Amino acid sequence: MKMGRRLLLRLTLGGCVLCPALATADPLQLGLPVACDLGRTCFIQSYVDIDPGPAVQDFACGSATYDNHDGTDFRLLSARDAATGVAVLATAAGTVKGVRDGMPDRFANAESRSLVANRECGNGVVIDHGGGWETQYCHMQSGSVKATVGQKVDKGTVLGAVGYSGLAEFAHLHLTVRHNGKAIDPFTGAERNASCQRDPSANPGLWDETVRPAHRYANGEIIAAGFTSALPDLKQAEVDGGIAPPTATSAQVVFFARMINLKAGDVVMLNVEGPGGFAAQSASKPLERNKATWIAYAGKRLKQSAWSPGTYAGTARVVRNGATVVEVSRSWTLSE
């Protein structure tokens, strides 16, 4: 009698012991949880923190995480991008175990932290994959959640859209993978207290063959760069990208670069050249501590009636221990 009740409970929660596709203790093979181009329209802001103490360490022995972070954050460039409806996808087949919707999208501040206490995940979905495996999807856009409790989903099923509900400082999806109730790092398939990997490509982790080629580990990344007529601001950039394209009579022309996961000691260098003798440079002092997000810019104010027509070119570099670890170039052309 007790055995029958346990079986019924497992079936009710979606862990069907008679369904071999779900009832397996083998590691999951996860697809990308966001319908985006990884490294171009979305980026990994934070990995799982595998350090058991107050220090931080990601799976690749880097610092692209924060203390006690139990998931992976896939970020968009701005809330404006999230407003277009970037889909959140089931990473593997399973049964929806829980959902929440209706929490507003708003960036976290001192006031909102208390409003989301015990609901920091915001709008989200939990999927039971059987064999003790489950995935949780957080910070989804208010009103976007399509999944329902008990629903069977396939890998790639649309669950809703990326947002910034709950405790979120930027538009992103937080994905947590668990096995038997314990958080698992999807980049290694191991629990959070495992050793880091000096070669992040040595272990495919839980990702399937569609994700592995797209992922390139980076502890320091330039996620956006270009020309603008306004001095960039990090908070505004999270709202709408912070870009106001320059014109022939803009009061200033500025080249900027937005970066994530910089390390203490990094130096950010910008160089801009253009027609009419246009030239501007900037070099930061070595950063005193790690920076989850950072913005740098260089430019000039207009001192004549209009900017000279032609192509303006800017280059941004992150220099670490004397070597360039990432570099991007962008241009802006002003027609005659």
Regions found by a protein language model. Name each.
Residues 87-98, 146-161:
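Short, well-structured beta-strand-loop connectors
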Residues 323-336:
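Short beta-strand elements
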Residues 310-319:
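A short tyrosine-centered beta-strand micro-motif
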Residues 280-290:
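Solvent-exposed serine/threonine-rich low-complexity stretches and specific carbohydrate-binding patches
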